[in-house]
Every structure is written in structure tokens, then in C-alpha cells.
């Protein structure tokens, strides 16, 4: 039995399988997940697990090179954006229109669906390398 880090087997596996520039999406409970993209559904009820809790644990396990948010988060969910940006600890951060964000999610290795029930609480995390 694994005793540290992410215990969810599919999520732990996806992170372990990432190569440089592969990416995953951490999503609120409303983001559409494209057909053919692996869905790791963590949602138990609205708000559980929270986007920020999930992001914190993923960042502890994953080597992140950069992140992308939808432009709309700045206006509609600045508290989540600020907290998530702080967690990313100086990593380059980009913003794209929400429609483009949804298009980008089609190329994700997986979309991790949280129970977050607040607008635009979604981020794309690009894998870096550990050397």
C-alpha cells in the first residue's frame, strides 16, 4: 500500500507516465471533458474535493513547467486564481479564452474532475523534467 503522496491510483499513474510537455487538466465539476480523454473523476459532492486542495497535492507529486488558465478566471474567480498562482511558485502562467482552453483540453493526457463548484476553476499543467 502506498503511504505518501496521491493515493488515487489512476491519478498517481497518469502523473508517473507524463513526459516533458505532456499536460493534464485539473477541472471544476462543470468543465466538459472531451470524448477520448481520460477522465479521473474525484468529485464526491459540490465542493469536495476542492480545486485548490487537488492542485496542492498534484503540485507536490508533479514536476510542472508552466500552467494555463482561462482568461475569464481573472474576472469571475480572482480568489481561486490568486491562490492557485501562489501555489505555482513563480512558474510561467498563461491565459487563453475559455473556448480555447476547452479546445486545449482535447490534447490532455487526463482531465481530473474535482467537486469544485465555482466558475472557471480550471488549470492546464504542463509537465517539466526533474533534471
Swiss-Prot record:
Question: What Pfam families has UniProt attached to this entry?
Answer: RbsD_FucU
Q: Which GO terms describe its biological process?
A: D-ribose catabolic process
Q: Which cysteines are joined by disulfide bonds?
A: none
EC number(s) stated in the UniProt entry for this protein: 5.4.99.62
**Lineage: superkingdom:** Bacteria
Pathway linked to the protein: Carbohydrate metabolism; D-ribose degradation; D-ribose 5-phosphate from beta-D-ribopyranose: step 1/2
Q: Which residues bind substrate?
A: 28, 98, 120-122
Annotated localization: Cytoplasm
Key words, A-Z:
Carbohydrate metabolism, Cytoplasm, Isomerase
- Catalysed transformations (reactions): beta-D-ribopyranose = beta-D-ribofuranose
Q: Which InterPro entries match?
A: D-ribose_pyranase, RbsD-like_sf, RbsD_FucU
Where is the chain membrane-spanning? none
Q: Where is the active site?
A: 20 (proton donor)
GO terms of molecular function: D-ribose pyranase activity; intramolecular lyase activity; monosaccharide binding
Q: Which SUPFAM superfamilies match?
A: RbsD-like (SSF102546)
GO cellular component terms, A-Z? cytosol
Signal peptide limits: none
Assembly information from the UniProt record: Homodecamer.
* Biological function: Catalyzes the interconversion of beta-pyran and beta-furan forms of D-ribose.
Q: Which family does it belong to?
A: Belongs to the RbsD / FucU family. RbsD subfamily.
Q: What is this protein called?
A: D-ribose pyranase
Q: Which organism does this record belong to?
A: Laribacter hongkongensis (strain HLHK9)
The protein's gene is named rbsD
